[in-house]
């Protein structure tokens, strides 16, 4: 008998199953597409970031990045002795017009409290850091260094 049954094998379901099983729980995942050929998560870009509005999401993003860095050790098995997330660390640039700037300034307070490493830049200064970006209509922008955000191979989590 299973201790926990998880409906849905997306990244949240798979991660929940992984951590519960590490605690000794017997876990079953029920997924409507066990091949994952049409499932949403493996078809996504596999992005990971820490630029969110809520503290919980910021902290979860930081945790995910650290977990991804530890994958070669945490997920190795006899069958797969050198697992990799095929991580590409490239950072994220998020841009906001006047209508969303105040909300982003409030979010930056959460970023600071969570030590997210987010940098803020005025839209008028954007071309100095990102000369290839058209900053017309941009009030403010946030970005992180290239090591803290990026994307992974989502199929790896289901292999």
Where are these regions (language model features)?
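Short, flexible, mixed-charge acidic loops at enzyme active sites
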Residues: 39-45, 132-136
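Extreme N-terminal leader/targeting segments of oxidoreductases
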Residues: 1-4, 19-23
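Dinucleotide-binding Rossmann-like beta1-alpha1 core, especially the glycine-rich loop
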Residues: 45-129
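Short beta-strand/turn micro-motifs composed of small residues
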Residues: 8, 31, 96-97
């Amino acid at each position: 008998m299973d201790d926990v049954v998880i409906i849905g094998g997306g990244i949240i379901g798979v991660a929940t199953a992984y951590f519960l099983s590490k605690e000794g729980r017997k876990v079953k995942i029920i997924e409507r597409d066990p091949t994952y050929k049409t499932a949403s998560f493996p078809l996504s870009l596999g992005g990971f970031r820490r630029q969110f509005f809520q503290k919980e999401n910021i902290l979860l993003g930081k945790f995910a990045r650290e977990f991804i860095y530890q994958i070669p050790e945490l997920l190795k098995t006899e069958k797969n002795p050198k697992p990799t997330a095929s991580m590409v660390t490239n950072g994220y640039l998020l841009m906001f017009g006047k209508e969303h700037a105040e909300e982003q300034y409030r979010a930056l307070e959460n970023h600071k409290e969570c030590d997210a490493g987010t940098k803020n830049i005025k839209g008028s200064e954007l071309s100095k850091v990102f000369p290839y970006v058209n900053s017309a209509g941009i009030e403010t922008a946030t970005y992180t260094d290239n090591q803290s955000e990026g994307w992974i191979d989502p199929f790896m989590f289901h292999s």
